[in-house]
Amino acid sequence: MPDSINNGHKESHDHRISNDAEMITDEKWQAIINNDAAYNNQFFYAVKSTGIFCKPSCKSRVPKKENVCIFPNTEQALRANFRPCKRCKPTNEKMPDSEWVDLITEYIDKNFTEKLTLESLADICHGSPYHMHRTFKKIKGITLVEYIQQVRVHAAKKYLIQTNKAIGDIAICVGIANAPYFITLFKKKTGQTPARFRQMSKMEETYNGNK
């Protein structure tokens, strides 16, 4: 059933984090939320929901405290499979565009049920909206918006086939609050309305079952 989001990315980090990460103290948390450059090179913080690690002075959106883990150096953060922030460059090296786009798609795949905008994604994934839009299209061949739509329509197909949820409920489940817009988008991407897609899927299932 498509009710749960795949957390494989998070789990890939967790087995390494416990060995290398330090406890987050109030002092370090204050340094993070205040972007305190005085703590740069004293520690680095990683965000489990994005797979990115930063300097304390990074100007990106303040993460949820429960998603943060602390590393004394960049080597240990890298060893735990976190990748350096493209904005604050904690390793003083530029992250390859392909790796950055992988992080973005990974985040979308896990969080497509939420409200996603170019601005919010750029903030979460530590880049500028314009650069993110341009880089994503260069690597993937489609825009960020098109990719999000693709992921949502794919998830909607699963709901239509595997559940009896109402069309409006499915729209909400895949991150689209406006049911008429969802129906229009689904038809644009598949050539069928959601109701017609469900009907055809059931007919195909019945036909195959009677073979």
Swiss-Prot record:
Alphabetical list of Pfam families matching this protein: Ada_Zn_binding, HTH_18
DNA-binding stretch(es), residue numbering of this chain: 119-140
Recorded catalytic activity of this chain's protein: (2'-deoxyribonucleoside 5'-methylphosphotriester)-DNA + L-cysteinyl-[protein] = 2'-deoxyribonucleotide-DNA + S-methyl-L-cysteinyl-[protein] + H(+)
GO BP, sorted A to Z: DNA repair; methylation
Membrane spanning residue stretches: none
Gene encoding the protein: adaA
Name listed for the protein in its UniProt record: Bifunctional transcriptional activator/DNA repair enzyme AdaA
Cofactor names: Zn(2+)
Stored InterPro entries: Ada-like_dom_sf, Ada_DNA_repair_Zn-bd, Homeodomain-like_sf, HTH_AraC, HTH_AraC-typ_CS, Me-P-triester_DNA_alkyl-Trfase
Induction data: Up-regulated by methylated AdaA itself in response to the exposure to alkylating agents such as MNNG.
Source organism of the structure: Bacillus subtilis (strain 168)
A single MF term (Gene Ontology): methyltransferase activity
EC number(s) per entry: 2.1.1.n11
Entry keyword set: Activator, DNA damage, DNA repair, DNA-binding, Metal-binding, Methyltransferase, Transcription, Transcription regulation, Transferase, Zinc
Residue span, HTH araC/xylS-type domain: 102-200
Record text on cofactor binding: Binds 1 zinc ion per subunit.
Known function: Is involved in the adaptive response to alkylation damage in DNA caused by alkylating agents. Repairs the methylphosphotriester lesions in DNA by a direct and irreversible transfer of the methyl group to one of its own cysteine residues. The methylation of AdaA by methylphosphotriesters in DNA leads to its activation as a transcriptional regulator that activates the transcription of the ada operon which consists of adaA and adaB, and of the adjacent gene alkA.
Positions contributing to Zn(2+) binding: C54, C58, C85, C88
Enzyme class: transferase
